[in-house]
Amino acid sequence: MAMRQTPLTCSGHTRPVVDLAFSGITPYGYFLISACKDGKPMLRQGDTGDWIGTFLGHKGAVWGATLNKDATKAATAAADFTAKVWDAVSGDELMTLAHKHIVKTVDFTQDSNYLLTGGQDKLLRIYDLNKPEAEPKEISGHTSGIKKALWCSEDKQILSADDKTVRLWDHATMTEVKSLNFNMSVSSMEYIPEGEILVITYGRSIAFHSAVSLEPIKSFEAPATINSASLHPEKEFLVAGGEDFKLYKYDYNSGEELESYKGHFGPIHCVRFSPDGELYASGSEDGTLRLWQTVVGKTYGLWKCVLPEEDSGELAKPKIGFPETAEEELEEIASENSDSIYSSTPEVKA
């Protein structure tokens, strides 16, 4: 009998969670940032979901959020026609980058010196963060609003997606190398540096392409419209979520569906594997983030696996290791197909 998923539920947002991103692994662990229509992106400890802080300053929905590799900086994209760069340690706003329309996506180079942005004005912009007063470099060519833009190939190239097109750009010449056209709206895009793989979702399809050439590798079909998908760092598994509130887990090599379960109480907008591959996070229309174990029952983070006593005949089952601080209250709830526990939540100030 398979063990049941026991997700960690991260509350605190008051509107739909539309984007999330993990940092790399640092000496202090790894971190998770979430973008939400409430305009208040949040930073959390990646392996427990515990709230660290909220970045305050946007005056509209935040559509995109990212952390640099060592989690010292954060960047956000918002409906207030700005992208902002933040000190992720202090929470201070470092700079506001004014745009002419809604900003949807942000991405740091590996050295954190440049920020790529894209949005409703159909332009890609590259900001030199060491020269905040300088005008950004601009790349035009998209025919509709840009949903996602990512650095790839050690920052030598850029991948960007609008409504029905994915484009590959050369950073040095600022010119288009190749494009892919789809017959329906592209809902998400993920870049995997190891192996240079691009994961694209559209409709019920999850497609894998070479990030260098955009040549197809393989594709899966899901039972419902998919809004986001993420490939495990070791390329063992793929997880996806979408309009039917469910999370799907696939064997990447065979394409076999390994499990599916109701993950949220609303459509799932974003899913991502952690940098160590031990868990994945999902964000939803229901306003929550949830963290899920890749291997159910393994001792990791707040999940503590308790083996059964000899001859008891009981199955091993995951137990939750409760933090010993009064501030971190964890409640157990039941959802349709899974148990759930809560990570620590933001402090409410009068």
Curated annotation (Swiss-Prot):
PTM annotation (Phosphotyrosine): residues: Y342
Assembly and oligomerization: Part of the core SMN complex that contains SMN1, GEMIN2/SIP1, DDX20/GEMIN3, GEMIN4, GEMIN5, GEMIN6, GEMIN7, GEMIN8 and STRAP/UNRIP. Part of the SMN-Sm complex that contains SMN1, GEMIN2/SIP1, DDX20/GEMIN3, GEMIN4, GEMIN5, GEMIN6, GEMIN7, GEMIN8, STRAP/UNRIP and the Sm proteins SNRPB, SNRPD1, SNRPD2, SNRPD3, SNRPE, SNRPF and SNRPG. Interacts directly with GEMIN6 and GEMIN7. Associates with the SMN complex in the cytoplasm but not in the nucleus. Also interacts with CSDE1/UNR and MAWBP. Interacts with PDPK1. Interacts with TRIM48.
SUPFAM superfamilies referenced in this protein's UniProt entry, alphabetically: WD40 repeat-like
GO molecular function, a single term: mRNA binding
Cell location: Cytoplasm; Nucleus
Biased segments, Polar residues type: 337-350
Region (Disordered) residue spans: 326-350
Presence of the UniProt keyword Cytoplasm in the record: yes
Database matches in InterPro entries: G-protein_beta_WD-40_rep, WD40/YVTN_repeat-like_dom_sf, WD40_repeat_dom_sf, WD40_rpt
GO CC list: cytoplasm; cytosol; nucleus; SMN complex; SMN-Sm protein complex
UniProt superkingdom: Eukaryota
Phosphoserine sites (modified residues): S312, S335, S338
Family, per entry: Belongs to the WD repeat STRAP family.
Principal cellular location given in the protein's record: cytoplasm
Name of encoding gene: Strap
Keyword set, alphabetical order: Cytoplasm, mRNA processing, mRNA splicing, Nucleus, Phosphoprotein, Repeat, WD repeat
Role noted for this protein: The SMN complex catalyzes the assembly of small nuclear ribonucleoproteins (snRNPs), the building blocks of the spliceosome, and thereby plays an important role in the splicing of cellular pre-mRNAs. Most spliceosomal snRNPs contain a common set of Sm proteins SNRPB, SNRPD1, SNRPD2, SNRPD3, SNRPE, SNRPF and SNRPG that assemble in a heptameric protein ring on the Sm site of the small nuclear RNA to form the core snRNP (Sm core).
Ranges for the WD repeats: 12-56, 57-96, 98-137, 141-179, 180-212, 221-262, 263-302
Protein name in the entry: Serine-threonine kinase receptor-associated protein
Keyword Magnesium: no
GO biological process: alternative mRNA splicing, via spliceosome; maintenance of gastrointestinal epithelium; negative regulation of transcription by RNA polymerase II; negative regulation of transforming growth factor beta receptor signaling pathway; neuron differentiation; protein-RNA complex assembly; spliceosomal snRNP assembly
